[in-house]
Curated annotation (Swiss-Prot):
Location(s) in or outside the cell: Nucleus
Summary of the function given for this chain in its UniProt record: May be involved in the regulation of cell cycle progression. Exhibits H3K4me3-binding activity.
Location of region: Histone H3K4me3 and H3R8me2a binding: 136, 244-246
Basic residues composition bias: residue spans: 27-43
UniProt region (Tudor-like domain 3), positions on chain: 208-253
Site feature location: Histone H3K4me3 and H3R8me2a binding: D167, Q174, D178
Cysteines engaged in disulfide bonds, as pairs: none
Protein name: Spindlin-2C
The species this protein was found in: Mus musculus
Gene that specifies this protein: Spin2c
Span list, region Tudor-like domain 2: 127-176
GO MF terms held by the record: histone H3K4me3 reader activity
Family assignment from sequence similarity: Belongs to the SPIN/STSY family.
Record-linked InterPro entries: SPIN/Ssty (IPR003671), SPIN/Ssty_sf (IPR042567)
Length: 257
């Protein structure tokens, strides 16, 4: 059984992110600067699959040191990388070569383990499914989080992307181990839910690369971009907001219907 999510500790070290979200999302037109940005970034040597280390300096806070694995480079914004940092359960989206808060970025000689999943059939079974994920809370209590398994993670193939109702950001765990230990349970599918292998009615194509505007409960707005569509659930997308390094996961059909 795992301890609670380590996102909170990461926010204290890397700067405060935004917590739970209740609001509305509006799709905006894509800006024209994307093509120039892609041409500048494409000349760099690929660091996907590499182990990295760097310092992090934000405002007057002391410098902290980070190590992690580069999981992916976002095609719609090649300067943006998805990174799994050691000891942190959520996936971060950072412009590793551009973000001024990142100090002394180094490519480490460490080898990344490319071991595959131990049970392919079980992996295919849990992807796209609503689940209940058990964590160990304070004083040994059990804390149950409802969420959805989104995909097998790139590079670290024994890990899976997952998001949760109470915290809709991108996490990754070794879920097959959790399933076999009884800490991950697949929830019964609702008769109203569409099959996982069929696009639900109302899915909007072509949202990747679109700019979004999010209105929070207090009326304030934040902007971001749709960077990925979840294959197992085509109505679900990853969004990277301009003011946050977390990757948010939204059902845009549900949000905009």
């Amino acid at each position: 059984m795992k301890t609670p999510h380590k996102k909170g500790a990461a926010k204290e070290q890397m700067g405060e992110g935004v917590g739970h979200h209740i609001g509305s999302t509006t799709i905006k037109k894509k800006k024209a600067s994307q093509k120039r940005q892609r041409s500048r970034s494409s000349s760099r040597r690929s660091i996907v699959g590499c182990r990295i280390s760097h310092g992090w300096k934000e405002g007057d806070e002391p410098i902290t040191q980070w190590k992690g694995t580069v999981l992916d480079q976002v095609p719609i914004n090649p300067s943006l990388y998805l990174v799994k940092y050691d000891g942190i359960d959520c996936v971060y989206g950072l412009e590793l070569h551009r973000d001024e808060r990142i100090l002394k970025l180094k490519i480490l000689p460490d080898k990344v383990s490319f071991s595959g999943v131990s049970d392919v059939r079980l992996a295919n079974t849990i992807i796209g499914k609503a689940v209940e994920h058990m964590f160990e809370g304070e004083h040994g209590s059990k804390d149950e989080w409802r969420g959805m398994v989104l995909a097998q993670a790139p590079i670290m193939n024994a890990w899976f992307y997952i998001t949760y109702e109470r915290d809709p950001v991108l996490y990754m765990y070794q879920l097959l181990d959790d399933y076999k230990e009884g800490d991950l349970r697949i929830m019964p599918e609702s008769s109203a839910s569409p099959p996982a292998d069929r696009e639900p009615e109302g899915v909007v194509d072509g949202l990747i690369g679109k700019h979004v505007e999010y209105t929070k409960e207090d009326g304030s707005k934040r902007t971001g971009k749709v960077i990925h569509q979840v294959k197992a659930k085509p109505s679900v997308y990853f969004i990277k907001f301009d003011d946050d390094f977390h990757i948010y996961v939204y059902d845009l059909v549900k949000k905009n219907s």
